[in-house]
Amino acid sequence: MNGLGRPLPIRPLVRYSSGGRDLLARHLAAGRRVFARLDRAPAALRGTMCRSQPNYFLPLDKAGIDVFTQPCPLRLVLEGTVRGTGGLRITGEDCATTVAGLHAAGDVATRELVTGAASGGGSLNGAWAISSGTWAGRGAARFARSRGPLPPRGELRPAGRAGMRPAGPGVSRPEVDAFVAAVRDRVLPLRHNYFRTARGLTESLRLLDALWEQARDRLGALPEDGRTALRAREAAALAAHARWMYRSAPAGAESRGVHRREDRPATDPGLAHRLLVSGLDRVAVRPDPVAPRRPAEAGVP
């Protein structure tokens, strides 16, 4: 709205362009608001669109927005592994992982085995959630039965440290919240995470590595403060995931999919493989041992 209470004019950014997403991101990163309107959708198809994708139109209906005639605000959302790219590595048909007894399912598990390099959403993700949940549950049950009785409690040793068992005294909830804010400051801004450069990735890693040392040595809560203890462990997981993400990004010295390198705008055919990331204090990145087939081997001229 302008000073007179009248709506400001909306200027079209892009109509039909493969660079529409980047243009949208640049305007959002600059602090501008971006809107969309589906006014070019044929009238005969609008009802079908609403029925076939209710999850898209329902929030707009609740907000009182007719997206076919009115502009609706847009924003970019970080979805982590929800869209089928990345996740815990699956090593067997029972959704086993590289950690004995840990079977992954749903959004937390990698889905490249069923989606390839494409992002999985909608019915594909729903089918994967049901199928992988069934397979993982059976695999976990078989593993548990094969282990026999549990050893006496006194023989068990806890494995987790960061955010749970710090070397020093625990921290307060405000300190945990400040830690989360510091991690988010390197992950959420589009200038850091979407428009990537070698220099920016190096700077993000430097800050995140320092935050990880804090998570390992200081982040934790007193046993009687259960809510802060949970929040501290979540904060440590957030820092770990951010480091995995930014440690693997430099290995992809190209632009591919949603991984955009401002200093490497082209796609490198030699990097058409997945990256495996592991480790906590020292993060390792290596190519997937299953090498991709070359076009000639795949029967493509």
Question: Can you say where each PLM-predicted feature lies in the sequence?
Answer:
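Mobile, glycine/GP-rich and aromatic-enriched active-site lid/loop segments adjacent to catalytic centers
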Residues: 1-120, 189-301
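A conserved FAD-binding loop/helix module that cradles the flavin
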Residues: 111-140
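A generic secondary-structure signal for well-formed alpha-helical elements
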Residues: 137-147, 253
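Long, amphipathic alpha-helical stalk/connector segments used for oligomerization, subunit docking
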Residues: 143-228
